[in-house]
């Protein structure tokens, strides 16, 4: 330790090593607290009253090509859940999203779409009670029609901590519905 550069290097190495050790302790203790709170088995979720709706859209923004109409799907649903066990002192925010998974065109393939999402930033807002909630997004399939396919709905989440890796999970509760067929209301009125 005879010159200023050596002293600075020693102090910087000590600070960096200490910071990494403290960050590791924070990450491990945060994960242990989530495990002790049973955060991965949230048993208080209820997804119900799913009402699918299908409409035709002519816009490129809704999957239309060459102005040919494209079926777009939306849903209306009820959701009851308590996500507060996912919050601790290291939780920055929780990204919650409602997905539907349905069979694809080829055997063994499946498609997954997101109808609704929300960012929750505090434990007080982590209890959701939604009635007749409309989906946030209108979705379309690569195929021309949803053709009365069955879909399984799940509530999934992404926990974003202040320090540490992103943590993905889903609730145990699932619900299912059959995509509605498009009915041309103008033709029905004639």
From Swiss-Prot:
Which residue spans belong to the Lumenal compartment?
33-190
Assigned keywords, A-Z: Endoplasmic reticulum, Membrane, Signal-anchor, Transmembrane, Transmembrane helix
Annotated localization: Endoplasmic reticulum membrane
Q: Which residues lie on this side of the membrane: Cytoplasmic?
A: 1-9
The question of whether Hydrolase is a record keyword is answered with no
Q: Name one GO cellular component term.
A: signal peptidase complex
Pfam (any one)? SPC22
UniProt topology in membrane: Single-pass type II membrane protein
Q: Which domain of life is it from?
A: Eukaryota
GO BP terms, alphabetized: protein targeting to ER; signal peptide processing
Transmembrane annotation, as ranges: 10-32
Can you tell me which family this protein belongs to?
Belongs to the SPCS3 family.
Record function comment: Essential component of the signal peptidase complex (SPC) which catalyzes the cleavage of N-terminal signal sequences from nascent proteins as they are translocated into the lumen of the endoplasmic reticulum. Essential for the SPC catalytic activity, possibly by stabilizing and positioning the active center of the complex close to the lumenal surface. Essential for viability.
Q: How does it assemble?
A: Component of the signal peptidase complex (SPC) composed of a catalytic subunit SEC11 and three accessory subunits SPC1, SPC2 and SPC3. The complex induces a local thinning of the ER membrane which is used to measure the length of the signal peptide (SP) h-region of protein substrates. This ensures the selectivity of the complex towards h-regions shorter than 18-20 amino acids. SPC associates with the translocon complex.
Q: What is this protein called?
A: Signal peptidase complex subunit 3
Q: Which organism is it from?
A: Debaryomyces hansenii (strain ATCC 36239 / CBS 767 / BCRC 21394 / JCM 1990 / NBRC 0083 / IGC 2968) (Yeast)
